[in-house]
Amino acid sequence: MKTQQGLSRRDFLRTGSASMLGLALSRLVPFAARQARADAAEISGAPQYDDWADVYRERWTWDRIAKGTHHVNCWYQRGCNWNIFVKEGLVFREEQAADYPQTNPDVPDYNPRGCQKGACFSHRMYDAGRLQHPLKRVGKRGEGKWKRISWEQALEELADATIDTIREYGPGSIVWDIGTAGTNGCSGLGIVRTCNVLDTPFLNANADIGDHHPGAAVTLGKICFASSADDLFYSDLILIWGGNPVYTQIPNAHFINEARYKGAEVVTIAPDYNASSIHADIWAPVNVGSDAALGLSICQVMVEEGLHDQAFIREQTDLPLLVRRDTRLFLRQSDLEEGGSDDVFYFFDPVAREIREVSQATLALEGIEPALEGEFAVATRDGEIIVEPVFAGLKRQLADYTPERATKISGTPASLIRRLARKIGRAGAATILTQSNFSKFYHGNKMERVKILVLALAGQ
């Protein structure tokens, strides 16, 4: 009997038997091959592997997984979370933990954090060039002759020398140079604690290597002041000015791209078309070391075109404060009263037509709009003088930094300077992303102060 497809019962059984035999052979042949390999391995002593992947499985085994991080690699917001794979007491692999919780559902999370510098940190830890034992100089200074000594001898000699020096010359005669490696973690805390107990000074590692941001320090009182990196997601204009975060801020750089996907415009101001420039909407070239001229020109355009935020300037900056035209110093209470304070300053109230003390309790102006321009006569203890707001002097100084003049210094096209100024002045939430570049320049403090001025004029 044949089916509708023309296949008889005998044909069906013959075909089915052949298929089942093929399936059986397909399982028997690999088993036989594996058995042959096992027999050969037993004879030769070679390891047994079912396939190439077993080689890696055998290699990547570990006793435990510890937690760790790496200090100072990125300067800002470092300390990425890493899983440390330990075998026989040695670190042999590091992997990003990538377990940061999302703190705000409207903002991208921090994951994964970490970069190739952290992934190879253990290589540095076990590098052959790393000093692992105390060495004592046995030749003349600079001769390069050393001998290995025990930890006991090293600590004893250091302690004796410290005690003798303090007794003879005082604690101020001992200076600790802890270096960047000692700025964080247990080693750094131990050194600082020792210095405090002994009353001995230690050098600032940031100043040693030019990471101390002197412009920010003298203008704002500290060198680190910023929101977390994910706050970039709220920016509509990001200026990468003084850094290359795609290379040097790898764990946080993804927030720049995510903000850009959201609609933010990214501008990189740099001498070279670097990795961060590639991922920017605009690259603004600038000659090395001329950023102050570029920044002042941006400020000049903002003031000339009325893009500066006058309400912000009046309340949040010292630009309304009165300055003496004769000494270029702030007008102080001590100028007006016998025994007056040196830290009480004044602004001019154009409605009341008189000077007023700047409150030391609040920034709120309570409806008063201090004058930003003009000259005013003030009676002091030494006679009448002329004063003006800081902003008036600033505006006069900025007149020398038109884009046409600044381009000769900075190399940035005048049209691009105006374009940048208008973007910054009209931005709703502009951010300048900077790093530790300008601290290493002569007059780098001026470059940092100018960037702060740009943001202040823009009300940012």
Named regions from a protein language model:
Residues 2-376, 383-386, 405, 413, ...:
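N-terminal export/assembly segments and adjacent metallocofactor-ligating motifs
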Residues 134, 161, 301, 397, ...:
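Residues that form generic nucleotide/phosphate-binding pockets
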Residues 170, 274-280, 396-402, 426-434:
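Short acidic (Asp/Glu) and glycine-rich catalytic loops that position anionic groups and cofactors
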Residues 389, 393-419, 423:
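A charged, amphipathic alpha-helical module
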Residues 404, 415, 420, 424-460:
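A glycine-rich, hydrophobic/aromatic-adjacent loop/helix-cap motif
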